[in-house]
Every structure is written in structure tokens, then in C-alpha cells.
Amino acid sequence: MKTKVIFAFISLLFLALSFSASAEHGLALYGEPKYPANFLHFDYANPQAPKGGTLTLATSYTASSFDKLNPFTVRGRPAPGLLELVFETLAVYSLDETMTQYGLLADDMQLAEDYSSIVFHINPRARFSNGDPVLASDVVYSFETLIGDKASPRFRSFFAKIAKASIVDNRTVRFDFKEANRELAFVVGALPVFSRKWGLDDKGAPLAFDQIVHQPPIASGPYTVEEADYGRGNLTYRLNPDYWGVDEPVRKGTHNFERINYKLFRDYDLQVEAFKAGVFDIMVEGKARNWCCVYKGVRFSEGEAIKKLFPHKNIPAMNGYIFNLRKERFQDVRVRRAFTLAFDFDWVNKNIFYEEYRQPYSYFSTTELAASGLPSEDELGLLEPWRDQLDPAVFGSMVDLPADKRNLRERLIEGQRLLEEAGWVYRDGALRNAKGEPFVLEASLTEGIPLPRIETYLRNLGQYGVIIKRRLTDQVSSRRDMQ
């Protein structure tokens, strides 16, 4: 017995020595977390908000039904809202910061100084919907289940760089990474956790994970499934009166509705009309034409329905035309500049987008990470050693695309000059290089993308003499092409 105790002590000592890091309540990929360790609630949450009532939602996608309550397997269509309302993760992102996580099921996190691993301590108050405590064994079970062959392959892909999960003690779990990478801490923080008791059969024996279909999840989230109407595509969640996290800082003031209903619609236009008729409560609109022209009528004029833009600081989804830089012709920045000049954003915005779009100036537009003005002193310190290899424009003011108010003809003239500098000259009916080879552009057009917006751009490129080859592809082929 004495030998075992000494061995255990040495093992714990080795673990402590090999993991030199301090416990953190939050992790920020950029800078420091906004909220201190003793924060009471997120700024955007209202702890005094009244509780009760019913919120009725529709999905952001079109579907007429769902057929399972397990969102982690391949077959079938999961019920909407499960991941957001029923399941919880080790950590949760704040909505007013860029890439910052705070402990949810975990009350502290220890990221190794060399970014090779992370340790989570599970909040002792955390409980599943059946009243069981959330333990390290549940975390490891969830991880191993999701990377197993009974779960969707997308989870194996998502956690591909996580080497293993191991139990340190009853409420402490460690994840080792396959490579030193601090971003993997955020990957692990997004691990959904569920009870191993979810999916037991009538005799208490566990079902294969892909056989868990209609059994209500046993998880730790604020809501549980109250009613699932698989035939009509209606679903009701009920706020768990014994929800463990109601007073946790990352949850306080949130999840205030007693019930949340989901209604499914097989057609987007039908969904829009249902919203206008008051069938459900919130509609997030992504089509410029609808935003401009559809949401009108008595309910709007009398204030019963409200149309409102909400500013945000999230990284926006990228929407644009992407150059394949593996093609030699696009490796010349002058060619890319000429192609950019041919895109008449103002015309497209006015005639197709109802002047509702804004031209981005950064991959991180609307966030604190977006570049602006001249490089800072710290940025210059990083850039100076590479000055001879960088475009001089890098050291100047940030390019402001909307500021270029020249008409299309003037921009095309400049674009033609840039192409000539790059060795592409118009002759014999096409844009050609010194070998006489034409500039052929293959445009991969994915099904579902409105063609007028891209046809206008392709027509402008044709004025340079670019030969356009259009290829219509489906979503699967398009993803394969990108790879």
C-alpha cells in the first residue's frame, strides 16, 4: 500500500511539473478576456429580465420535418435547436468579443505554456437534466463517442488534432494535442457533453450511439424536450426548472422564455409569409430583395411587427469571388488588381442588392481585428525586416475600396494598363501573353447562387478580352473543386 501511495504521489508531482500554467476563467485568442474572473454577467444579458412566456421560432433553413433527437449521427434530420438549448460545452464564447471563451461546464481552464495540452476543471454545480453531476468521465465519454465510428465523421474531423482525453480526477479532465497550437484549446472548449445514461434500453443496457434516435437527450442545457411532433415538424422545449447554471455568470440573464417552439417550413417564401401573418416571432432575413420590399403591411405600420437592423462586431461571412492562386496567371498582383477594378460594386449594389450591401475592406470587417489607417509602430516592427519583399502599399494607408468612385470605363482603362504591364495584351480577339496564349477564365457557378450578380462581372472581364468558360456545379462538386 505504501508503495502505491508513493507512486501515486510521484505521478501527480510529475503531472504538475509537466503542466506549468495557471488556472484561467477565460481564454482569449487575441489579447486578454474582457470580463474579469469575478464578473457577474455578460454586458448584453439582463439579470432582471422577466421569466416566462413562449417564443416561437422557425429554422434558418427550409425543411418540412425532422426525424431524430440525436444531432451527432449521420442518418436522419435532427430536430432544430438541440445543440443550442439542450447540450452544453466546456466553454462558451462571449458575443461581444472576438474569439474569447469563458468556462461553462468548466469553472477554470489551464492551457499549457507550450500549448500542447489543456486541463478543464468541471464546475461542481454542473448537473445533467436527470440530476446526475457532470463528471470528468462524462466529458471523456462524450469525446470518445463523437470521434468514434457511430457518430458523424464531421466530429472526427473537427477534433482531428486532439490526441486524447484523460481523467485526472473525478472533476478534472486533460486533453493532449497532436501539435502545439493554442487554437486547439478553443476546439476542445466547444466539446458538447452528454450523459452515458442517454440511450439506455428498457433493461438498462446501452444502445449503439447511432441507434439513439427518439430518446430525449440527457444533457446539462437550460432546456429539455417537452414535445416532438415528427409528422408535422413542430417541436417544443421547456425551461428546466432545476437548471444548474441559472446563476452562473455566463448564463445569468439569459434563457428567459418558459417554452421555445420551433415550426418548420418546406419553402422559404412560405416561411416569409408565415412570419408576416404572425405564425412565429423572429425572422432573420438574408435576402436583400426581401429586406427591401417584402416586410411591409399593417402589422409593420402599426408596430405589431418590427423590422430592425442590429449592428454587430462578429466576423462576417465572406461573400465574393476568389482567385485560385495556384494558377500562375493569378500570382501576379497586377492581374488581381485589374480583375478587382472590373467589379462594379456600386452598380451591382444599386441594381441587384437594393443598396443594402456594404463593401468589406478586411476579412475581419466590423471587428477590432480589422486593419485601418497606417501600420502601427508595433506592426512596422514586424514588417520592416521584410520591406524589400513586400509591396510598398503595405506600408501605406489601408486601401479603402468604396472610396474609388471612378466610373467603370476609367477603372477598366487602368485595369488594361496593369494587364499590359503583367504581359497580357489584347490582340486577335482575346487577351494574350507573349506566347500568344489566351487568358481563359473558368468560372465555377454553384447551383443556387443568383446568376445576374456574377454575369455582370464576367461581362466586364470580357471587355479586357478574357475568354470566359462557365461551368455549373452542384454544392458537392463545388466543395471538391475548392479542395
Predicted feature residues:
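N-terminal lobe/hinge region of extracytoplasmic solute-binding protein
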Residues: 23-114, 144, 151, 218-220
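Short, well-ordered beta-strand elements
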Residues: 26, 52-61, 107, 117-120, ...
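Aromatic- and charge-enriched surface segment that lines or borders ligand/interaction sites
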Residues: 45-50, 72-79, 108-152, 168, ...
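Gly/Pro-rich hinge or "lid" segments in bacterial periplasmic/extracellular proteins
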Residues: 76, 82-97, 189-259, 266-270, ...
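Surface-exposed binding/hinge segments that line
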Residues: 121, 156-203, 221-229, 373-389
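A short beta-strand/turn structural motif
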Residues: 141-145, 158-161, 181-224, 250-257, ...
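Extracellular/periplasmic solute-recognition and catalytic clefts
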Residues: 146, 164-166, 226-238, 263-327, ...
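Append "and occasionally in soluble cytosolic enzymes with long acidic Gly/Pro-rich linkers
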Residues: 238, 331-459
